[in-house]
């Protein structure tokens, strides 16, 4: 039986040869100073160009957006030039690549902001930790401070930063952008009543909590077109103080509003289970959003086939498997064995654990 994973589809106006997505994966290997993408990053993404779609790692829309060490930006001329190396390399291999753009909000540290507090919808601290590198890029997890609540007038500036980042991404050669509204970062912080305790037009009711996401979406689609704009949500993310009692209906309402705007796709990530809630949420999102839906969350080939056959989603993203298997689509299609990822090399470092994972053909053709 033919797997639906290998059927062609499209995202906006972009034809895709298969339904296998490489999702955004923070790898913390941008060059310093300046958080600039490099030729090594270009090699990494080009190795994985057989994905139906690559969504490049979460990228800062501004210097103020930063929340982790060694992550790239798309707000300086050097960064745009660095990303052009990446997109050119992927396109030469016949691939397709979007860029995920983000603002970390409260998931940040004063060291990234010259001693100033990170900003957020409200002065509510993030309950978890973020990764911060030391003097020699030796990383470690550190607690986040209580953020400063954004003034109402400042929010428009961040919307403008998202718009400019999208324009910069297109200048750098990306086929589109993904707005990161998931996983507890700034837009998600606005969506949740646990992190958003504002009393102005951006807080309180669900309508108000959706406002920032929709303003960002309108700004980005107005700049580069809806067909080149995707959005990521995480309705079932309840970790680190994000357990909002209406997170699922808020995400479903967001999906409906995004559908009205004609965005290219909706991307959701799941906790990686097969619970009844997972199916219910996928069905609700499908009812609200008729366009392409990408799902991520620890999927195997078998689970991916099943969820595609259900009609609840259209494409499946594979994160850790793509880290270790640059030729993942071929391995999945032919049933070839998979390389095992090396977690110690996920964040920071050099080529080891980044561009040195072998392809299956390379493995099989090693001389005796």
PLM feature spans:
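Flavin-dependent oxidoreductase catalytic cores
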Residues: 1-368
């Amino acid at each position: 039986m033919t797997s639906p994973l290998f059927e062609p589809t499209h995202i906006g106006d972009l034809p895709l040869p298969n339904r296998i997505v490489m999702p955004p994966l923070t790898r913390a290997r941008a060059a310093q100073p300046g958080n600039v993408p490099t030729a090594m990053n270009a090699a990494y993404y080009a190795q994985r160009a057989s994905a139906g779609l690559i969504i490049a790692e979460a990228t800062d829309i501004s210097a103020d957006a930063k929340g982790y060490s060694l992550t790239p930006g798309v707000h300086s001329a050097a960064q745009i030039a660095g990303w052009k190396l990446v997109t050119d390399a992927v396109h030469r291999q016949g691939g397709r690549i979007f860029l995920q753009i983000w603002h970390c909000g409260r998931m940040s540290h004063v060291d990234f902001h010259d001693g100033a507090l990170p900003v957020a919808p409200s002065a509510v601290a993030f309950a978890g930790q973020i990764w911060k590198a030391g003097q020699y890029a030796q990383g470690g997890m550190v607690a986040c401070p209580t953020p400063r609540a954004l003034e109402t007038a400042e929010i428009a500036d961040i919307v403008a930063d998202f718009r400019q980042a999208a324009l910069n991404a297109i200048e750098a050669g990306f086929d589109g952008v993904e707005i990161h509204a998931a996983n507890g970062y700034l837009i998600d912080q606005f969506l949740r009543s646990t992190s958003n305790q504002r009393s102005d037009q951006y807080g309180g009711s669900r309508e108000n909590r959706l406002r920032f996401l929709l303003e960002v979406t309108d700004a980005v689609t107005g700049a580069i077109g809806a067909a080149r704009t995707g959005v990521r949500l995480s309705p079932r993310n309840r970790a680190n103080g994000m357990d909002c009692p209406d997170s699922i209906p808020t995400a479903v309402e967001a999906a409906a509003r995004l559908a009205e705007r004609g965005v290219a796709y909706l991307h959701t990530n799941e906790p990686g289970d097969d619970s009844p809630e997972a199916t219910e949420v996928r069905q609700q999102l499908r009812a609200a959003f008729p366009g392409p839906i990408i799902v991520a969350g620890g999927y195997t080939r078998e689970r991916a086939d099943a969820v595609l056959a259900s009609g609840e989603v259209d494409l499946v993203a594979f994160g850790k498997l793509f880290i270790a298997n640059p030729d993942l689509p071929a391995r999945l299609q032919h049933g070839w064995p998979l390389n095992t990822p090396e977690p110690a090399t996920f964040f920071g470092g050099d080529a080891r654990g980044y561009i040195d994972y072998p392809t299956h053909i390379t493995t099989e053709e090693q001389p005796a």
